[in-house]
Design a protein with these regions (language model features):
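N-terminal [4Fe-4S]-dependent radical SAM core
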Residues: 1-42, 47-59, 70, 74-80
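Auxiliary Fe-S-binding modules of radical SAM enzymes
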Residues: 2-20, 69, 190-261
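Short hydrophobic-acidic sequence motifs that mark active-site Asp/Glu residues
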Residues: 24-26, 84, 144, 183
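Short glycine-centered, acidic/aromatic-flanked micro-motifs in structured strand/loop junctions
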Residues: 29, 87-89, 186, 225
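Conserved Radical SAM active-site core
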Residues: 43-139
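Conserved AdoMet/S-adenosylmethionine-binding subsite of the radical SAM
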Residues: 95-224, 229-236
Length: 261
């Protein structure tokens, strides 16, 4: 097992240039020295969950607000550009018990300092069954939700959800209820984990994803692959030409999709 690869040691981080979103200011609702997540993905840049939740605890609404306000004021005063405020960080942002209230506060601050900037949430979809969380996701500009495989065994192998009741069937059904506003992100990879082959790029996998996408009717699908080191060492990046071929096949089925590498 590798050590943690990337942790964000503050509540607000960046801005950084995101290959998917542009100039992005990050919001980390998890501990500054550990990871809390409802998945334990083989490819997570923050490492496996077993490496620890840290000691700092979750930031309060007041801390998030104060830190974000200070950063936005500084950027605005310096005439800097900002495309998006992105909830990501050290784990699953929707696990924060005050996620809906924090969303509303971030919207308020965005409107005050960078009204043209978007607000994005990168989520693994595990908390969309909570109506308060789903309603909060409906209030942001880019509600970006994960679906790495539409085949149950593959999803469990890659994403390793903590909740045994989290299934592909349930999440696809709930994603449909966003009625075309959700953006779906899918990580493409292959390799092996503890002697078991891992590959969500096969024809069977792509057909299952197409069926799921057509059912969900997302605003867009973001198709991407590994960009940093991963806790599972035996994973292989899917290169741009192959990503484009997969995206073309999905697009031909009537799905709006964009490959990133």
């Amino acid at each position: 097992m590798k050590d943690q690869t990337v942790l964000f040691h503050s509540t607000i981080f960046g801005p950084v240039h995101s290959r998917r979103l542009g100039v992005s200011l990050g919001v980390n609702l998890m501990p500054n020295d550990g990871k809390i997540c409802s998945f334990d993905c083989l490819y997570c840049e923050a490492g496996y969950n077993a490496q620890g939740v840290g000691t700092t605890g979750l930031p309060t609404i007041e801390q998030v607000s104060a830190d974000l306000k200070a950063t936005l004021q500084k950027m605005h005063g310096a005439g800097e550009h900002l495309d998006v405020i992105t909830f990501s960080g050290n784990g699953e942002p929707t696990l924060h018990p005050h996620f809906p209230e924090i969303i509303d506060e971030v919207i308020r601050l965005r409107d005050a300092y960078f009204a043209e900037a978007k607000i994005s949430v990168l989520s693994n979809s595990t908390r969309i069954f909570d109506d308060r969380v789903a309603d909060a996701l409906d209030r942001v500009d880019n509600n970006i939700l994960k679906l790495d495989s539409a085949i149950e065994d593959t999803m469990r192998l890659i994403d390793r959800p903590n909740d045994p009741n989290f299934t592909v069937e349930r999440v696809v059904e709930r994603l449909r209820r966003f009625e075309g506003t959700a953006i779906i992100q899918t990580m493409m990879l292959r390799g092996e984990h503890e002697g078991t082959p891992v590959d969500n790029t096969t024809p069977e996998e792509i057909e299952a994803l197409i069926e799921a996408y057509l059912s969900i009717r997302p605003r867009e699908v973001m198709l991407y692959s590994i960009d940093r080191s991963t806790p599972e060492e035996n994973l292989i990046r899917v290169e741009r030409p192959e990503l484009e071929q997969i995206a073309a096949r999905i697009s031909a089925a009537g799905v709006t999709i964009q490959p990133f590498s």
